[in-house]
């Protein structure tokens, strides 16, 4: 498992039903999530998805997609997100995150579909912010600890 990678997208939307836009940088706030995002303050504060998952789907289906198209807040490169156990801690730019959920039930409300495809439920992870800080495209994202919370 790769222990570090980089941030290739910092994405937000004003409304839950809108496509997220890669704004390049943002502030992750403890107990809230990505400042300015429609999902900030929810139980799943921040969502992460690997660009490799997006690229694989594009290659398999012929669609074109970019960071944010699948409703993720942070698009990563070079780190195997779904292999991280719940409770893992990540350093993402200046902020620290804790993995609280791997994937999600695709039948849940607000499961976003882009051109009929929804990969966040099976290949994304959800985190809470445990230390506030800035995050921007090009920042490293590093696994600090992978011990499971009981």
Predicted feature residues:
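Metal-cofactor-dependent catalytic cores
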Residues: 1-150
């Amino acid at each position: 498992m790769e222990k570090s990678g980089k941030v290739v997208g910092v994405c937000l939307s004003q409304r839950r039903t809108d496509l997220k836009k890669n704004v390049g940088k943002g502030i992750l706030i403890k107990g809230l999530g990505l400042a300015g995002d429609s999902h900030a303050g929810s139980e799943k504060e921040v969502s992460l998805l690997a660009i490799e998952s997006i690229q694989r789907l594009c290659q398999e289906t012929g669609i074109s997609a970019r960071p944010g198209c699948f409703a993720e807040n942070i698009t990563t490169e070079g780190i195997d997100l779904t292999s991280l156990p719940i409770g893992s801690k990540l350093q993402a730019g200046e902020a620290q995150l804790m993995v609280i959920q791997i994937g999600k039930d695709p039948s849940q409300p607000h499961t976003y579909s882009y051109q009929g495809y929804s990969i966040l439920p099976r290949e994304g992870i959800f985190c809470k912010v445990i230390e506030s800080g800035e995050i921007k495209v090009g920042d490293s994202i590093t696994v600090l600890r992978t011990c499971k919370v009981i």
